[in-house]
């Protein structure tokens, strides 16, 4: 609704001789007696106007010039809010817009010509995907979907962590299990990867090579074999959740020198050094964040010669700027909270515009059954495996449950609830609303000859009851919900919104006879139902869940 009110409020401000660059807020009052929408613009610009907010609100109301049939009443409330009451026909026109635009309802071209990159999942290829990584994957996928509705050219990227100490430990783990297959007695280190999948990779190598690799200390063949198997497994798991990536960035490329040029990591060190932010002591190389007011410097290259996570992360982001992205969204787990501010500080020092970098941190996931914490793992080590969760509750429930709480909140994933075929299950509740409308349309086609193809919403202005207006009002919010979800990188807002739409539709369905109504009213209510179905479908597409036509 901001798009509707904004030009009229700006026009009133101009008539009043008030210039401001402050963002005009349009909100929905919790209590409908305060109108359908309200704005606090009088508070925001009272100082510039040299008037108290209530007096200014009254002046602005006199200057607002809305088209006939849209706003029925405008009033000053409290210390200076401006409340707007809309005509029922205005809400119904929004439902007509849904039918006219179809899949395009809620979309715009605000991001046209802009390139965005969303990096998500980026799990180390050291084992099967865990549930925690799955939450980040769904979050990132939904954010990418939201960006596409706004016209951005979106690249979905997986930062492939194929370098560093953990990959060496993976290779050593496979080698130890391989040597066991060769008949050697091995004391397997507790610090290494314990899952059954390590033994399975070793078994494959033994079948292919016999004991021919037993005498070598070279880890490359073990690393490459493990990496190929595990990464293939990761991609298959993600595909089950309809999570895809357009590009895979190999971390090892940040360590490589090219055509006589230093590696990307080394270029970061050199550039920070030139700015006076590199220190060398205790055998390590440090990012001197004490110069930025921090208590301690942060290590970039350890005394072992291995880089910390910060160095390749900084170098990786430099490549994003070099690739010309206008917006860079990074989806991380909570373990990155402490590290990432240092990456942004380094980028600022290097002269990059960090306002283009957005961070979405998602908290941990705990699976519960009957209120008790459980491990979703059948055999592959002590881990909560994403595949096992999908096997148990399905892809739709997995996706929706991951994002039905805010990303900043720890998620208790109730496995029993996710499997319920009742309105208590949020997934069932949403999908049932869609299936109910599909069933209604089929019945209308059969019983009264309703033709969905000719439904353009011409009869919608007939509708004026409270359930009908409330339902149409909810549809009107869809474009704003997309914008809000994107600004906050929070798909949970879309989940909550769709629940409201479904809830209002179920109420409308119960209180407003449809097939038994007279012809014109029946057609109008069927058209409103079609508009609801379209909004649900558009929302489901953003969330990546299916829209069943029967349940």
UniProtKB/Swiss-Prot annotation:
| Manganese keyword on record | no
Which InterPro entries does this entry report, sorted A to Z?
A: Arg-tRNA-ligase, Arg-tRNA-synth_N, Arg-tRNA-synth_N_sf, ArgRS_core, DALR_anticod-bd, Rossmann-like_a/b/a_fold, tRNAsynth_Ia_anticodon-bd
List the CDD domains. Answer: ArgRS_core (cd00671)
Molecular function in Gene Ontology = arginine-tRNA ligase activity; ATP binding
Q: Which reaction does it catalyse?
A: tRNA(Arg) + L-arginine + ATP = L-arginyl-tRNA(Arg) + AMP + diphosphate
SMART domains, per database record: Arg_tRNA_synt_N, DALR_1
Principal subcellular localization: cytoplasm
Q: List localization entries.
A: Cytoplasm
Give the EC number(s) under which this enzyme is classified: 6.1.1.19
Q: Does the keyword Nucleotide-binding apply?
A: yes
GO CC entries: cytoplasm
The annotated subunit structure for this chain is:
Monomer.
Family named by the database record: Belongs to the class-I aminoacyl-tRNA synthetase family.
What is this protein identified as? Answer: Arginine--tRNA ligase
